[in-house]
């Protein structure tokens, strides 16, 4: 996060290239970078940590010495991200995927 509470962009040229390619190829794009950015910024630096595998010593059986993993999600984080994917499917009306959503 930046000092003003916005998420720091670490993707470089990847995101514009991804968006351009989707537009050129005429394929739908669920822009998860934008969706997750909005989620993380709404939660803020401290609350967004609850989505990831971040824990003190003894908190995770698989990481007895503690862990700071800003890439992989805890269950609650995975559920939130899956919800954003479902939201994108609905927004783009991606048939037949929409028929599998609740």
Q: What feature does the model see in each segment?
A:
Residues 1-102:
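Catalytic His-Asp segment of secreted/periplasmic serine-dependent ester chemistry enzymes
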């Amino acid at each position: 996060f930046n000092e003003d509470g916005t998420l720091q962009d670490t993707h470089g040229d990847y995101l514009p290239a991804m968006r351009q390619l989707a537009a050129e190829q005429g394929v739908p794009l669920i822009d998860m970078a934008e969706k997750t950015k909005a989620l993380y910024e709404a939660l803020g630096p401290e609350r967004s940590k609850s989505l990831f595998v971040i824990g003190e010593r003894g908190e995770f059986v698989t990481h007895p010495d503690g862990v700071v993993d800003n890439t992989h999600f805890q269950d609650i984080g995975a559920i939130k991200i899956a919800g954003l994917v479902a939201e994108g499917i609905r927004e783009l009306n991606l048939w037949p995927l929409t028929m599998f959503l609740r």
